[in-house]
């Protein structure tokens, strides 16, 4: 959530920054509610001052043995009036919070203005795409090595996949390799987190209320739960309602979880294969840090995700998302796009975002700087390190051979009991 003080102190700047994202801030509605909030606050403070004055008068009258019935009646009337004003204040504040909960984060000054993915500048590339002496296939056409879309549809429906045999083991190996790299080389703390979370948790990272249609929801007795669309939700909320000491920062969490997305609005996109699934595995990275460190933390986080692709020898590029392509909670985002020779193009495999204090304000996640009494909001960052299914897709397409075999990257062979290739079944 955007800082309310920033809205009150520099509304034109906020409106202009949001306009860069293509977001039309409801300025008139906001100003009306803000004026009501201020008026209620001033009225409540005035009534409280009058009550305090009457309280002193009542105390003096009682000490002198004087009749104070009239004063007490006035005090009761003021208390009733103040309660009504405070109820009005709370209702107005609730309406303000509802309005602001659907307003996206402000873009960082370094983020280029743009409309969509066509306006995203490329920052760098790594690796050279392989030259094939045959026409490489898309992964969806490599079904004989263990991709079973038919049973995915039978068991659940469209956008679900069954993996068989060595391919299923490779999928598991990829996740284990990612976890080992991030914990042993990059210093992350591995976490095992719930896949079902309550509404407050998923509100904290910004999925509610604006993106409820993208979520899977279930109910137990009178309690609502949401299936996580990413482990970012669970990992980031570990610090919700907490006041951390600066000495423990930065925190770096990693988790391997399934993720669940309805893919609302994706009809007709990536209908073949594993690129866009309702259920997929991902290794997620989360940083909790100080405002002073968050810019550098985004570069570190992105480098950690890149390291996985480098160790797997998969060509990729880094893209800086423009204002029109960023996620709701992000202030700045880098996308990693891996080369898929079967498709003949780069495809997203990771998004690494700095959310500044946007999520922290919703979660009330704070830290206390050394020597300071008053806590301040942490900064939160998240990124895929990486999407497991899309990494599998990239391996299938980049390591395919003319005879139908899929070579296993050297970095993954220790996780495959020395197996160096997957051979297609008859």
Curated annotation (Swiss-Prot):
Residues 114-125 have a biased composition (Basic and acidic residues). Its main location: cytoplasm. It catalyses: tRNA(Ser) + L-serine + ATP = L-seryl-tRNA(Ser) + AMP + diphosphate + H(+); tRNA(Sec) + L-serine + ATP = L-seryl-tRNA(Sec) + AMP + diphosphate + H(+). Keywords: Aminoacyl-tRNA synthetase, ATP-binding, Cytoplasm, Ligase, Nucleotide-binding, Protein biosynthesis. It is an enzyme of class 6 (ligase). One of its GO terms (cellular component) is cytoplasm. Pathway: Aminoacyl-tRNA biosynthesis; selenocysteinyl-tRNA(Sec) biosynthesis; L-seryl-tRNA(Sec) from L-serine and tRNA(Sec): step 1/1. Belongs to the class-II aminoacyl-tRNA synthetase family. Type-1 seryl-tRNA synthetase subfamily. Catalyzes the attachment of serine to tRNA(Ser). Is also able to aminoacylate tRNA(Sec) with serine, to form the misacylated tRNA L-seryl-tRNA(Sec), which will be further converted into selenocysteinyl-tRNA(Sec). This is Serine--tRNA ligase. It comes from Dichelobacter nodosus (strain VCS1703A).
């Amino acid at each position: 959530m955007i800082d309310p003080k920033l809205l009150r102190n520099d509304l034109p700047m906020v409106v202009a920054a949001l306009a860069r994202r293509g977001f039309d801030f409801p300025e008139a509605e906001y100003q009306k509610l803000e004026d009501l909030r201020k008026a209620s606050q001033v009225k409540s403070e005035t009534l409280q001052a009058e009550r305090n004055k009457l309280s002193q008068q009542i105390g003096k009258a009682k000490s002198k043995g004087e009749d104070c019935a009239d004063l007490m009646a006035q005090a009761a009337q003021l208390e009733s009036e103040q309660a009504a004003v405070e109820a009005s204040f709370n209702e107005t504040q609730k309406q303000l919070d509802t309005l602001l909960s659907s307003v996206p984060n402000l873009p960082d000054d370094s983020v280029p203005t743009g409309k969509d993915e066509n306006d995203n500048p490329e920052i760098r590339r790594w690796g050279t795409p392989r030259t094939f002496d045959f026409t490489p296939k898309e992964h969806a056409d490599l079904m004989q090595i263990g991709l079973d879309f038919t049973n995915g549809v039978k068991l659940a429906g469209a956008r679900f996949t069954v993996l068989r045999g060595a391919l299923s083991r490779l999928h598991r190996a990829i996740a284990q390799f990612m976890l080992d790299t991030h914990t042993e080389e990059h210093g992350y703390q591995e976490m095992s987190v719930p896949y079902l979370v309550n509404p407050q948790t998923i509100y904290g990272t910004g999925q509610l209320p604006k993106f409820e249609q993208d979520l899977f929801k279930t109910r137990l007795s009178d309690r609502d739960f949401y299936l996580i669309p990413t482990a970012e939700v669970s990992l980031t909320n570990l610090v919700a309602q907490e006041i951390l000491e600066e000495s423990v920062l930065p925190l770096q969490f990693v988790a391997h979880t399934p993720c669940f997305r309805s893919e609302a609005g994706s009809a007709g996109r990536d209908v073949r294969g594993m690129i866009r699934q309702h259920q997929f595995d991902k290794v997620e990275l989360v940083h909790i840090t100080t405002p002073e460190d968050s810019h550098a933390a985004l570069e570190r986080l992105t480098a950690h995700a890149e390291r996985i692709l480098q160790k797997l020898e998969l060509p990729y590029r880094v893209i800086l998302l423009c204002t029109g392509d960023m996620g709701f909670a992000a202030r700045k985002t880098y996308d990693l796009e891996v080369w898929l020779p079967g498709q003949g193009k780069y495809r997203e495999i990771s998004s690494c975002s700095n959310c500044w204090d946007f999520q922290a304000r919703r979660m009330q996640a704070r830290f206390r700087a050394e020597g300071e009494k008053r806590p301040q909001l942490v900064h939160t960052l998240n990124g895929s390190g990486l999407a497991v299914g899309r990494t599998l897709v990239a391996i299938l397409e980049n390591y395919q051979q003319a005879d139908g075999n899929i070579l296993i990257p050297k970095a993954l062979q220790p996780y495959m009991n020395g197996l160096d290739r997957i051979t297609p079944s008859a």
